Amino acid sequence: GCGGERDKKKRLTMGKIAKKYCRKIFVTDDNPRNENPKKIRNSIMKGCKKIAVEIGNRKKAIKIAIKELGPNEILLVAGKGHEKIQDYGNKIINFSDKKIIKEIIHKKKFSSKKNHYQNFLLKKVFDNNNLRNVNYNNVSINTKTIKKNDLFFAIRGKKTDGHKFAREAIKKGAIKSIISKKIKQLSKNKIIKVKNTFSSLNDLAKATRDSTSAQIIGITGSVGKTTLKNLIGFALKNYGKVYQSPHSYNNKFGVPLSLSNLKRNTEYGIFEIGMDKKGEIDNLSKIVKPETAIITNISGAHFKNFNTLTDIAKAKAEIIDNILDGGNIILNKDDKFFNFLSNKARKKKIKIISFSSKKKADIFLLKTRKVKNCYRLKIIVNKRIFYFDTMYSTNNFINNILACISVLSVLNLDLNKMGKKFINFTIPSGRGDIKMVNKFKKRFKFIDESYNANPLSMLSAIRNMNYYKRKNNSQKLVFLGDMLELGKKSKKFHKELSTLINRSDIDKVFVYGKYIRETFNSLVKNKKGKIFNNLKEAYDHFSKIVHNNDLLMVKGSNATGLNQFSKNIKKGQISAI
């Protein structure tokens, strides 16, 4: 409001300023004095018509504004905080903004209502009158994961239509099914009808992101995203409430689904962002809007849709465009695209934090040494020395440790707290976890890299075999599958693997797949194991040739079936190493 009999020119200006910075404005009376209150309000309204509501009664205006206030939003009640009266010229009213606000908040107790947050989010997304007390717990697009009071989105995918499962979701306890077409035998109070369920899921993700006060971290790169996400989540749990995207939920469905499940009390949110083609990271990071982003590395993981590594680097760099103002980008200084990525970040005025396991950087590895049953890493963080103990010493994992420490440093957290904590971190299954297994009436070391494969991760896994120590005369055996989605460069990349294998101390290489035969055919004779036609043949063969204390490593793209093969091997696991 504006006072009467005061500077009239400022009224329009106040309306314009409010419109620039606020999502909603309530224009009410200040001290009209002897002026017409309606005319004063009209002068302000001219500057902010589309998003302003005119309510002359100041108490009513404050009450409605508080009622509509969402989580983490600020309500500015301006003009009369210092006064205890309202002047209408011929009438003086006892009135205190402070007193009125305290009374309304005390009666409403909105901050402690569990369902206020969810209702606020749903009302931002859906134009629906049937949204009172929709106290949903989680958001799901898969009835296999539905629990009581979850919100189910019926998404149409390539293989199936979620609408087929909308009734099943309700039977399993879903509070609402979001649908875009009529479904028989589903009551109106159990549905929210929309034009497009996928768009609505994205809208809920955006509303959730815009309403959180959590520090949001986005991770992309060609290799190591999921392990790094888990590692950062593991570390941040020592400092506050953490939410991280589950599994490898990094595509156009997984990212908005993960964001929609971000809880109100979360302090740190960690999201993995993947891609298959140009523009995907841009679209997904626009939803995530990270304060801090990490690009782990650039490699030929997507040549099916890209011609060069530079094209892949440009696509990964899209995340930089969507880092919030004043945000940070954490980059691997050992990656050959470091300068390219850092140049883009500088142009965007994004702060760059570098890490390295080979050279000086903001955060870099100085030394690794074996200490009893673990490895002690001496790491320089912004010119200060810190020590961290871990169970793993492979280059991949050390890079993940460095990236994780970079995040902790950016957030100004006490690094000494993590000195001994990394020992308890377990690498996710299929991403380099090491187990001692009892299988085929033998006890041997099993290195599971079977979740996925691209040229960089494959070379790294092969290189790591040189660091694993033999016990007595044990064998080092490798079982490799195809690296998929490499397009025209597939033959070249598969053949190049043989150069590294031939120089390694791997004893025998076994393969299964179409493209990996290029690798096998280029191996020196004494390293050639066998080409398998199916996985049963592979299973039967390993049951005969694996001995006690041998090392067996399995790696290939997920679609090859090697991940399931590895799960069958690990059914007899004893313990992690």
Question: Residue ranges of each PLM-predicted region?
Answer:
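ATP-dependent carboxylate-amine ligase
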Residues: 1-132, 145-151, 157-164, 291, ...
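Non-catalytic positions within long, well-ordered alpha-helices that form the structural scaffold/packing
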Residues: 166-171, 285-286, 502
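Phosphate-binding loop of NTP-binding sites
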Residues: 109, 116-127, 198-333, 337-350, ...
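Short gly/ser/thr-rich secondary-structure transition/capping motifs
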Residues: 8, 59-60, 130-139, 199-202, ...
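Residue-level signal for inorganic ion chemistry
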Residues: 25, 77, 150, 169, ...
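Short, basic phosphate-binding NTP loop
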Residues: 112-218, 227-238, 260, 387, ...
